[in-house]
């Protein structure tokens, strides 16, 4: 009334109040009862609504490697997200998980909050599988492993470098025969392996549905809300 909220009107009754708290939740996790109705209510009061979308959400990748490594959790890796221009927009150390649809886990959920421009930009992930070693030290480690078992297959050698389910993917990307002996590995193959372990890349095509997101990004435009009290500046 006269630009002020004076209560809540239900289907049968009206509840007068000096103030009304609008706390309906976002559109993520609808199983909790959050339907996003609060956006409609706020809009009816004149508030501008920034289109809501899921945040802290798993990411979809069409890279077949994700399906091949489904269920594999990587620990102590560094994840970098690059945009179309190759600029790093996220970099963090931690854990992630390969799934049947792409990638998930703490690192990926954190990264998803920085990917807001799917309509105009493209993104790819770059995983440093050995962040504790620079390229020179990693190559020395590989040389040592190859030299200690010169007649062993690279398939077995690589199992000491990466998780077992990742070995076929590594060999496929390098174009190497799993049964190639360690003493037959060329300098070029060794350096290609170093690059792959430090920059294991894959494209991502978008986030999973908002129903799977942990939080909602967007909603009532923050400039129309008092930051100290969260009270509306409009009513």
Feature names for model-found ranges:
Residues 27-30, 105, 115, 228-229:
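Glycine-rich nucleotide phosphate-binding loop and flanking beta-alpha elements
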Residues 1-4:
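A conserved short coil-to-beta-strand element within the FAD-binding core of flavoproteins
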Residues 8, 15-30, 42-43, 96-101, ...:
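Short hydrophobic core segments
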Residues 168-235:
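A glycine-rich dinucleotide-binding beta-alpha-beta segment and adjacent secondary-structure elements
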